[in-house]
Amino acid sequence: MAFAGNVPDRIIAIGDLHADLKATQELFSHIGLINADGAWIAKDTVVVQTGDVTDRGPDGKNMLEWLQQQQLAAQQHSSKLIILMGNHESMNIRGDWRYVSPKDIQSFGSLNERKAALQPQAEWGLWLASLPTTAQIQDTIFVHGGISPHYAAPSSSINDSVRKAHLGVGDRNILGSDGPLWYRDYLRAPESDACPKLKLALERIGAKRMVVGHTTQRSGRIKMRCDGAIFGIDTVFASKA
C-alpha cells in the first residue's frame, strides 16, 4: 500500500511484537502513541508495524484485539496504524503453528477455539489475510523480511501477489525464503553482495530506502547498512519465548 495524503508530522516504524502485549503497550506509551490509561493520543502520526504480531508470546488473541482497537482509535486523531504481514502471520494463515505458545492458545480459550478463530472466513483469519505485505511512504518502503530484486515491484503489485499466493491462485514461491516475508540477505550477506542487490530492488520499487523487521538485532539497536538504504528494526524488545 502507498500512503495517500499529506506527509504526516511523524512516521514511526516498529518491529516484531510476537504476542507480547505488555511490552507493546509499554513501547506505545514510551513513544507517545498512548497515554497512561492506554488511550491513543498521537495526532498526525503514521505508525508502520512491520509484521510478526503473532506467535511466541502469551497474548495472541488479546494482542490482535488491542491492535485492531488502536487502529480505529488512531483514525480519530488523524493518525494511522499500519500492520504489515509477517512470516508468522503467513504461517498462521496456512495452518503452520510451530511457534504458537500454550498461553497463546489459552488466550483464545482452547486449541479448537483458536483454530476456529483463524479459519479463512472467521474474524481473525480474515483480518490476518487482509494485512498488506508492504507499505510505501514517500521514498521509504516498509516490509517484514526484505524485497529481493526478483520480487521487486511497486508496493501494490507485491501485496497483490502475496494475497493471491495465500489464496492458492498465485505463485506460492513468493511465500518462501526469497520472498518479502522471509528474505534476510540485506542484513546478513556481506555488504559487497547485499548493497548492489538492494540498490537494484529499490530502483524497481521506486524507493530510496527499505525498513525491515524479521532479522533480529541482538545488540538491541537498529542496524543500518548500505549507506542508509536499509534499516533492520527487530531489536528483540518483545517476547521470544
Regions picked out by a protein language model, each given a short descriptive name:
Residues 1-241:
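Feature recognizes metal-dependent phosphohydrolase scaffolds
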